[in-house]
Amino acid sequence: MSDTTFDYIVIGGGTAGSLLCNRLSRNKNHRVLLIEAGRKDDYHWIHIPVGYLYCIGNPRTDWLYQTEPDPGLNGRSLRYPRGKTLGGCSSINGMIYMRGQARDYEQWAQLTGDDTWRWDQVLPAFRQHEDHWRLDADQLAQVSEEFRRLHGNKSIGSGGEWRVERQRLRWDILDAFAQAAQQAGIPATDDFNRGDNEGVGYFEVNQKGGWRWNTAKAFLRPTCYGRPNFEMWTHAQVSRLLLQDLPGGGQRCTGAEVWTGSEMVTVHAEREVLLCAGAVNSPQILQLSGIGPGELLQRHGIEVRRDLPGVGANLQDHLQIRSVYKVQGAKTLNTMASSLMGKAAIGLEYALKRSGPMSMAPSQLGAFTRSDPGQPHANLEYHVQPLSLDAFGEPLHDFAAFTASVCNLNPSSRGTVQLQSADFRQAPAIAPRYLSTAEDRQVAADSLHVTRRIVSQPALAPYRPEEFKPGVQYQSDEDLARLAGDIATTIFHPVGTTKMGKSSDAMAVLDSRFRVRGIQGLRVVDAGAMPTITSGNTNSPTLMMAEKAAGWILKDPEENSRTSSAEPEVLFRLTL
């Protein structure tokens, strides 16, 4: 920590922060500091795909947040996992590669007044860092004509850092569920990333050769580690941002105060501070710095530097309702892992082949469909698993079963993230307010009816599925909505707490280029910037946002005269 002045300070070494460090430090004249509150991603369970079970709820890798008791969940409080390690949530998540639907980004363009957020404008940013299995040399000849017809030359990329692969195992019970979904009217698909996700099929995942592929591997190691202009601090937590008043009004962010575990260090940014701490921690850091709802800050004795009521508001998340079905005559993870011999066989298969249950994502099969025929588009997502348990961290059930988890892709419920004191070490109050609207409660009930319709199809009949949760005795919409509050849990997709928006939107924290309103030299680049939640898993959209942010930052007029010192681009781009 000999030098405390840098060009760019990146706060948070997770999904967005890792990519930004990679892109900004390519120019040898850019001194880049990465500040990460967690540890290096050297915990072995991070890299074994099934290891998410041992990372969630583990202080080595998780912030261990809890939500406030939630009326929509009948007073329950949920564990709210957030990655506290290099790679952030990409080190502990479900590894599913999902862009979202085209209409998500068309809506962003409308809400921000910026057409660069339209679907056809974000696709290049997705492809920029993509390394897709379909474009591997040994796979090109097998790409179907149907895939080519659907996608033309605007679909996937190769040669980037972000590896996308097929899953390395299949299950008969999941194949039967897919067939049942088709019998229920949901079409088959081999691609959930074409812009219209409706269909049933197997998810693609961010893995490489049977290992989790997190953003620390993809963007930091070894590339950034070998650059003399890049510095990284781990176990270092930002207590607040430093703001300087400007003549004529407004402020400029000049740096941050950082607790290293033994001392408070002040770091300075000559160009920009990039806050990438996630949809929970970024609003907390802003609030601790005097940026946020004035009344909230004053209540905790914090000087109001910029009254932005939207900081910590607009929290959105996907709430998964987990229906569990007992089955007969099916191989499931419950039965495979029920004995020492079974566990040994699972471990041996992974050790020898990097395949089998230890290589699997939490959810293998997915489906996008509509909660009722009147919906104009797919508003439900299924994550189907060949296992069952009462809650993450609990043991698997001792009977053969599968779980059909369904979530409302576009909830209208909105929550908050608010600091609880001026002490940066105290966790913020997280109040998602799930199922707080009549619309969301109706979709919850409808989604359980859809699940039952799928499971009742002939394809699953040989396995004699028996509903274990929520229970066939509950039939009315009112009962099912109430039961959803008893059994539903987060699917770990919080977004929106520092949203982008038009200048006319009083709740917008950022402009469409991630710049904090009224404060120069400060951007927030993470899932909190999303105006609305995407229709699917949120990790890869966050990475796309960081790619666009990097491009905008480097196009600053000050940079134009310095581009000659940038490292040559060695990655190639191949699109299909």
Language-model-detected regions and their locations in the chain:
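Conserved redox-cofactor binding core of oxidoreductases
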Residues: 110-253, 322-344
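Internal hydrophobic alpha-helix adjacent to the cofactor/substrate pocket in enzyme cavities
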Residues: 181, 449-456, 547-559
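Glycine-rich loop(s) and the adjacent beta-strand/alpha-helix scaffold that form part
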Residues: 27-31, 39-43, 241-349, 356, ...
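Extreme N-terminal leader/targeting segments of oxidoreductases
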Residues: 1-8, 26-29, 551-576
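FAD cofactor-binding and catalytic pocket of flavoenzymes
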Residues: 324-444, 490-496, 504, 524-527, ...
